[in-house]
Amino acid sequence: MNLMLTLFTNATLASLLILIAFWLPQSYAYAEKVTPYECGFDPMGSARLPFSMKFFLVAITFLLFDLEIALLLPLPWAIQATNLNLVLFMALALITLLALSLAYEWIQKGLEWVE
């Protein structure tokens, strides 16, 4: 009963949000709206600065490794196994996979800022 109530509530809420988004007026972007505003003056230069692809790749790599560590920390409590050796083996396998991934990134020069 509890599961059915939760599913019904979630489906109703999702449908309600979809209907609200459908009926709300759409805002349209036009040339004046998307141009940068600098205190009423004409812009001196382009507001669209080039984005460093190296920074983006390092940031994505950091996020992946950070999420893996965040998943590794609560592993003993999440598994709740009676066999401690199994938990230690799984944690060691995950750490080994992370170390191999880091070594691969290092060898491929994925962590270098300047070439």
UniProtKB/Swiss-Prot annotation:
Belongs to the complex I subunit 3 family. It is found in: Mitochondrion inner membrane. One of its GO terms (molecular function) is NADH dehydrogenase (ubiquinone) activity. Disulfide bonds: none annotated. It comes from the Eukaryota. It is a multi-pass membrane protein. The keyword Mitochondrion applies. Its EC number is 7.1.1.2. PANTHER family: NADH-UBIQUINONE OXIDOREDUCTASE CHAIN 3. Pfam families: Oxidored_q4. InterPro entries: NADH_UbQ/plastoQ_OxRdtase_su3, NDAH_ubi_oxred_su3_sf. Keywords: Electron transport, Membrane, Mitochondrion, Mitochondrion inner membrane, NAD, Respiratory chain, Translocase, Transmembrane, Transmembrane helix, Transport, Ubiquinone. This is NADH-ubiquinone oxidoreductase chain 3. The chain crosses the membrane at residues 3-23, 55-75, 87-107. GO terms for cellular component: mitochondrial inner membrane; NADH dehydrogenase complex. It catalyses: a ubiquinone + NADH + 5 H(+)(in) = a ubiquinol + NAD(+) + 4 H(+)(out). Core subunit of the mitochondrial membrane respiratory chain NADH dehydrogenase (Complex I) which catalyzes electron transfer from NADH through the respiratory chain, using ubiquinone as an electron acceptor. Essential for the catalytic activity of complex I. GO terms for biological process: mitochondrial electron transport, NADH to ubiquinone. The gene is MT-ND3. Core subunit of respiratory chain NADH dehydrogenase (Complex I) which is composed of 45 different subunits. Interacts with TMEM186. Interacts with TMEM242.
